[in-house]
Protein backbone atom coordinates (compact mmCIF):
# COMPACT_ATOMS: atom_id res chain seq x y z
CA UNK A 1 0.00 0.00 0.00
CA UNK A 2 1.36 3.40 -1.02
CA UNK A 3 1.90 6.04 1.65
CA UNK A 4 0.28 9.44 1.46
CA UNK A 5 2.47 12.31 0.32
CA UNK A 6 2.12 14.41 3.50
CA UNK A 7 1.13 13.77 7.09
CA UNK A 8 -1.37 16.63 7.35
CA UNK A 9 -3.01 19.35 5.29
CA UNK A 10 -5.33 22.21 6.23
CA UNK A 11 -7.89 23.58 3.77
CA UNK A 12 -9.32 27.01 4.70
CA UNK A 13 -12.25 28.06 2.52
CA UNK A 14 -15.73 29.38 3.27
CA UNK A 15 -17.32 27.55 0.31
CA UNK A 16 -18.94 24.22 1.18
CA UNK A 17 -18.91 23.05 -2.44
CA UNK A 18 -15.26 23.98 -3.00
CA UNK A 19 -14.30 22.26 0.24
CA UNK A 20 -16.16 19.11 -0.80
CA UNK A 21 -14.55 19.02 -4.26
CA UNK A 22 -11.05 19.83 -3.02
CA UNK A 23 -11.14 17.44 -0.06
CA UNK A 24 -12.30 14.61 -2.35
CA UNK A 25 -9.41 15.37 -4.72
CA UNK A 26 -6.93 15.40 -1.81
CA UNK A 27 -8.26 11.99 -0.71
CA UNK A 28 -8.27 10.53 -4.23
CA UNK A 29 -4.65 11.60 -4.78
CA UNK A 30 -3.56 10.26 -1.39
CA UNK A 31 -2.16 13.69 -0.62
CA UNK A 32 -2.22 13.54 3.18
CA UNK A 33 -2.94 11.19 6.07
CA UNK A 34 -4.99 13.87 7.80
CA UNK A 35 -7.12 16.41 5.90
CA UNK A 36 -8.64 19.16 8.03
CA UNK A 37 -11.23 21.44 6.44
CA UNK A 38 -12.17 24.70 8.17
CA UNK A 39 -14.77 27.05 6.71
CA UNK A 40 -13.79 30.13 8.73
CA UNK A 41 -10.45 31.95 8.74
CA UNK A 42 -10.93 32.92 12.39
CA UNK A 43 -11.52 29.28 13.37
CA UNK A 44 -8.46 28.33 11.32
CA UNK A 45 -6.28 30.79 13.27
CA UNK A 46 -7.43 29.19 16.54
CA UNK A 47 -6.83 25.72 15.09
CA UNK A 48 -3.29 26.66 14.03
CA UNK A 49 -2.47 28.12 17.46
CA UNK A 50 -3.66 24.92 19.13
CA UNK A 51 -1.81 22.76 16.59
CA UNK A 52 1.41 24.72 17.11
CA UNK A 53 1.17 24.24 20.87
CA UNK A 54 0.90 20.48 20.29
CA UNK A 55 3.73 20.50 17.75
CA UNK A 56 1.30 19.29 15.11
CA UNK A 57 1.13 22.01 12.47
CA UNK A 58 -0.02 20.96 9.00
CA UNK A 59 2.70 20.58 6.40
CA UNK A 60 0.53 22.19 3.73
CA UNK A 61 -2.14 24.89 3.98
CA UNK A 62 -4.51 25.70 1.12
CA UNK A 63 -6.00 29.16 1.68
CA UNK A 64 -8.85 30.86 -0.17
CA UNK A 65 -8.52 34.58 -0.90
CA UNK A 66 -12.13 35.80 -0.78
CA UNK A 67 -13.77 34.95 2.55
CA UNK A 68 -16.00 36.77 5.03
CA UNK A 69 -14.55 37.77 8.42
CA UNK A 70 -11.08 38.20 6.91
CA UNK A 71 -9.67 37.61 3.45
CA UNK A 72 -6.68 35.41 2.71
CA UNK A 73 -4.24 38.31 2.88
CA UNK A 74 -5.51 39.42 6.29
CA UNK A 75 -5.22 35.78 7.38
CA UNK A 76 -1.57 35.75 6.29
CA UNK A 77 -0.91 38.94 8.27
CA UNK A 78 -2.47 37.37 11.37
CA UNK A 79 -0.46 34.20 10.82
CA UNK A 80 2.77 36.15 10.43
CA UNK A 81 2.09 37.96 13.72
CA UNK A 82 1.58 34.72 15.68
CA UNK A 83 4.62 33.83 17.81
CA UNK A 84 3.59 30.17 17.47
CA UNK A 85 4.19 30.35 13.72
CA UNK A 86 7.69 31.85 13.85
CA UNK A 87 10.06 29.34 12.31
CA UNK A 88 7.21 27.03 11.32
CA UNK A 89 7.57 25.11 8.09
CA UNK A 90 4.08 25.22 6.62
CA UNK A 91 3.81 25.43 2.83
CA UNK A 92 1.01 27.88 2.06
CA UNK A 93 -0.80 27.82 -1.27
CA UNK A 94 -3.38 30.46 -2.12
CA UNK A 95 -6.25 28.50 -3.64
CA UNK A 96 -8.79 30.76 -5.29
CA UNK A 97 -11.07 31.31 -8.24
CA UNK A 98 -9.94 34.97 -8.25
CA UNK A 99 -7.87 35.86 -11.27
CA UNK A 100 -7.59 39.50 -10.19
CA UNK A 101 -4.13 40.71 -11.27
CA UNK A 102 -3.81 42.69 -8.02
CA UNK A 103 -4.40 39.52 -5.99
CA UNK A 104 -1.86 37.59 -8.02
CA UNK A 105 0.69 40.41 -7.59
CA UNK A 106 0.10 40.46 -3.81
CA UNK A 107 0.58 36.70 -3.69
CA UNK A 108 3.83 36.96 -5.66
CA UNK A 109 5.13 39.57 -3.21
CA UNK A 110 4.22 37.57 -0.10
CA UNK A 111 7.10 35.46 1.21
CA UNK A 112 4.74 33.22 3.20
CA UNK A 113 3.03 31.95 0.04
CA UNK A 114 4.63 29.18 -2.00
CA UNK A 115 2.30 29.58 -4.99
CA UNK A 116 -1.08 30.69 -6.32
CA UNK A 117 -3.35 27.84 -7.44
CA UNK A 118 -6.55 28.40 -9.39
CA UNK A 119 -9.53 26.38 -8.10
CA UNK A 120 -10.24 23.54 -8.17
CA UNK A 121 -7.34 21.33 -7.11
CA UNK A 122 -6.36 18.78 -9.73
CA UNK A 123 -4.24 15.66 -9.67
CA UNK A 124 -1.59 17.41 -11.78
CA UNK A 125 -1.36 20.33 -9.33
CA UNK A 126 -1.19 18.05 -6.29
CA UNK A 127 1.47 15.84 -7.88
CA UNK A 128 3.64 18.94 -8.50
CA UNK A 129 3.63 19.93 -4.81
CA UNK A 130 6.78 18.75 -3.05
Please tell me what each predicted stretch does.
Residues 37-50, 72:
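Helix N-cap/capping motif at the beta->alpha junctions
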Residues 67:
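Receiver (REC) domain active-site loop signature in two-component systems and cognate sites
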Residues 46, 73-86:
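Short amphipathic alpha-helix used as the core "switch/output" element in two-component signaling
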Residues 16-38:
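Two-component/phosphorelay signaling modules centered on CheY-like receiver
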Residues 52-62:
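Active-site beta3 strand of CheY-like receiver
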